[in-house]
Amino acid sequence: MRSQGNMSDRLGVEVDCHSLGSNECPSMGSSFSPLESPTPTPTSIYSQGSLASPSWPENGSYPGHAYDRGTGSTPIRGHFRLASMPSHENMGLPPYSSLDGQDRMAVTDFLPSYDENADQFWLPSDVPKTYDHHVHGLPCPPSMHQYPPMLRSNYRHHPAPYFPESATNPCLSRPIFHHQPERLPPSLSMSHMMPWMGHTESIAPETIAPSQVAPVTPPPSYTDFSNSINTFKTHSPDTPIRSCSLGTVSGADTPLSRLSGGAGEYMDECHQSPIYRDASGVRLQRQPSRKMARKQPSKQSLSLENLPSIIKQVQFKCKEPGCKGRFKRQEHLKRHMKSHSKEKPHVCWVPGCHRAFSRSDNLNAHYTKTHSKRGGRNRYVATLDETSPDYNPDYRGPLTADGRPMPGGTLDESMPSREISMEWDE
């Protein structure tokens, strides 16, 4: 597409139609077709970049319309030269009717001083808008659209009027709650905001399906919210209702209802979850469950208030000098005292060992940890090994070289009998 400046240099109109012949008139081809837009356009010889001009009167010019600039002495034919342009050249531009509304340019965008001298280019409304190709001899198709006359004020570029969103959005321009039409002030309706719109151009009021409106509830006002709270307090069903329920009596739970004026009192009651209200409005403590009742005594026993002021001291102390042993039970002290005695009555029966212990439990530990394992420095005894087939902890007798018991053999040595200690730590 050529630039606007080059196009404006080549645009021009021969005003004096007496000097134009039938072959010198610009062709009315596809590039110069009239506008196909349904919007009425001004019948000017410079209409919106289209070179299609209306029909000329028989005398060739209009009296009282000097096609000259108002601010200069140079006629406009000196600025716009169209006669030198080839008749079939379409300037590389698409037809104006095929352009979108945003791509179309006004004449004032590339013609200087057009807006201020627009009075000189407007034709009377009573002039016919069609060409008579028999009279003028112009190659113009007879099937040309006739545009109704329009006012000049409709052609000027007026700024788009500003309307609030409630006036342009049909969802906000009418009340969507049929049972409470007073929620929306009548001043915000579409008919009051745009009285200049005709009946055919107005938007249909029913733009929301009833299925979409049904589950929606109107946001309650402060007075409705207070009334619902009072009704909720005086309600006495068969089962107690928790006061922290976020729903109102009507079941409406909207964000605006939680932000209304009574939300402070409403949320304060929600923090009182373990409290019920009866019909008279008196608070009743919720009955604790049995499980909670069982846990309460154990928690009370662990509190510092229930503990005794003086902890019971250890009563049994070791009397040996230098020993700080303390015991809670007497049998524990007795067993401890054997460790301080010089007597070691419990002796190992394994040949070659003969270790003695003061306590029988220590001797049993010696059997289990020392003689029941292979590879140690102590002698292995198969009768003391739980994993061996010869396991017999009561066996006392001669052993083979590998630690197995000898068949029919008995131990004649005078050794202390194996004592099993019945004492253990508690």
From Swiss-Prot:
Q: Which GO terms describe its molecular function?
A: DNA-binding transcription factor activity, RNA polymerase II-specific; RNA polymerase II cis-regulatory region sequence-specific DNA binding; zinc ion binding
Read off the Gene3D superfamilies from this record.
Classic Zinc Finger
| Compositional bias ranges of the Basic residues kind | 288-297
Q: Which UniProt keywords apply?
A: Activator, Conidiation, DNA-binding, Metal-binding, Nucleus, Repeat, Sporulation, Transcription, Transcription regulation, Zinc, Zinc-finger
The biased composition feature labelled Low complexity covers: 30-44
Tell me where in or outside the cell this protein is found.
Nucleus
Q: Where is this region: Disordered?
A: 25-71, 281-302, 384-426
Look up keyword GTP-binding and say if it applies: no
Q: State what the entry records as the consequence of deleting this gene.
A: Abolishes completely conidiation. Results in production of bristle-like structures instead of conidiophores and conidia and fails to produce ergot alkaloids. Reduces significantly expression of gliotoxin biosynthetic gene cluster including gliM, gliP, gliT, and gliZ. Impairs down-regulation of genes encoding ribosomal proteins under nitrogen-limiting, but not carbon-limiting, conditions. Abolishes the production of fumiquinazoline C.
What does the induction field say? Expression increases dramatically during the synchronous asexual development. Expression is positively regulated by hsp90. Expression is controlled by upstream regulators fluG and flbA. Expression is controlled by the histone methyltransferase clrD. Expression is decreased by 2',4'-Dihydroxychalcone (2',4'-DHC).
Cite the residue ranges of zinc fingers (C2H2-type). 316-340, 346-371
SUPFAM superfamilies reported in the protein's UniProt record: beta-beta-alpha zinc fingers
Compositional bias ranges of the Polar residues kind: 45-58
- The reply on keyword Zinc-finger is yes
Where it mainly occurs, coarsely classed, is: nucleus
- Coiled-coil region(s): none
Single GO cellular component annotation? Answer: nucleus
Gene Ontology biological process terms from the UniProt entry: conidium formation; regulation of transcription by RNA polymerase II; sporulation resulting in formation of a cellular spore
- Pfam families for the chain: zf-C2H2
Q: What does this protein do?
A: BrlA, abaA and wetA are pivotal regulators of conidiophore development and conidium maturation. They act individually and together to regulate their own expression and that of numerous other sporulation-specific genes. Binds promoters of target genes at brlA response elements (BREs) containing the conserved sequence 5'-(C/A)(A/G)AGGG(G/A)-3'. Positively regulates expression of the gliotoxin biosynthetic gene cluster in actively growing vegetative cells, and likely bridges morphological and chemical development during the life-cycle. Regulates (directly or indirectly) the ergot cluster genes.
What's the protein name?
Answer: C2H2 type master regulator of conidiophore development brlA
The organism's lineage is: Eukaryota, Fungi, Dikarya, Ascomycota, Pezizomycotina
The gene for this chain is brlA
